[in-house]
C-alpha cells in the first residue's frame, strides 16, 4: 500500500540536510521508525548553473515558506537577471534523490537527473513548481507543456524511482 506521509500521524520531519541525498535519507529513516514495511523518502529541486546551483535544496522555500509556484519562478527569473543571465538558455537540471528504508535501516539511495535549460518566460500549465520554465535537453517544450506520460519517462523523479524499483525487486524477489 502506498501512503502519503501527510496522511499519517508521524511528526513533521525537518529537512536540515545539506544535500538532496541527506534530506531524502532523513525522511525515509524517520518515517521507517513509525511505519511498517518499505518506506521511501524523496528530496528534489532545480539547480541553475548561473546561480551556482541555486535554488537547489531550497527549491520549495526559495521565495518563502508559503510562496506559490509563480512567486518561486518570478524570484528565480529576478535572480537570473540580477547576475546578468537573462535570455533563453541558462543551463540547469532537476535532481531527485529517493531513499529506501525499513525499520530504521537505510537500504539505499537512488538519484535521477534531467539536464536542460531555463527559459525567460513561463510556458504551459501542466506539472508544478518550476516546470513551466524548464526545457529538458532534446525538447522545445517546457515540462509545463509536456504530457504527463512524456515527462514521467524523462524526469529526474522517474529516473530515481525506476532505479529504486530495481532495488525493491531484488529485495522482494531476489532478482
Regions found by a protein language model. Name each.
Residues 1-175:
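Anionic-ligand binding patches
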